[in-house]
């Protein structure tokens, strides 16, 4: 009985470890941690932070995690993944299902500074690809005149 319980527990732990390893360990906690790091970088030196975000430098490209930023006044994308053209209007973004997730991103940027909004289940390509599209969840917050976010893929 005890041996069966130990084997079952070990098997369950192995399955959990495998699922975490397969996911790359990049979920909501890692996305929120990178968002906090991005917010600190923007507050310290906005211009340098945006350059690092675009280039994926300073730890701002970790597997599928990366920050993005846009101006809260007009929604103009300033730091974006390659799948979104820099300078485009974030409000016009729609996924392959027609979901206007860009309007949700923009609305999240209008909330009080420091408030983090979760944007759920829109489809977006992973970094360096244009297809296929994957289900993504992003966390967005206002930082001065910008809104920045980091998302993870499900």
Positions of predicted regions on the chain:
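N-terminal membrane-sensor/transducer module of prokaryotic signaling receptors
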Residues: 2-11, 15-154
């Amino acid at each position: 009985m005890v041996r069966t319980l130990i084997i079952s527990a070990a098997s369950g732990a192995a399955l959990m470890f495998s699922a975490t390893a397969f996911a790359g360990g990049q979920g909501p906690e890692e996305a929120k941690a990178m968002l906090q790091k991005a917010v600190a970088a923007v507050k310290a030196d906005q211009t340098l932070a945006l350059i690092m975000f675009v280039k994926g430098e300073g730890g701002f490209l970790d597997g599928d995690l990366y920050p993005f930023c846009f101006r809260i006044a007009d929604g103009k994308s300033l730091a974006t993944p390659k799948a979104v053209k820099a300078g485009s209007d974030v409000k016009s973004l729609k996924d392959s299902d027609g979901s206007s997730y860009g309007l949700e991103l923009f609305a999240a940027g209008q909330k009080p500074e420091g408030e983090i909004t979760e944007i759920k289940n829109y489809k977006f390509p992973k970094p360096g690809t244009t297809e296929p599209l994957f289900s993504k969840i992003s966390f967005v917050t206002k930082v001065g005149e910008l809104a920045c976010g980091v998302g993870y893929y499900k």
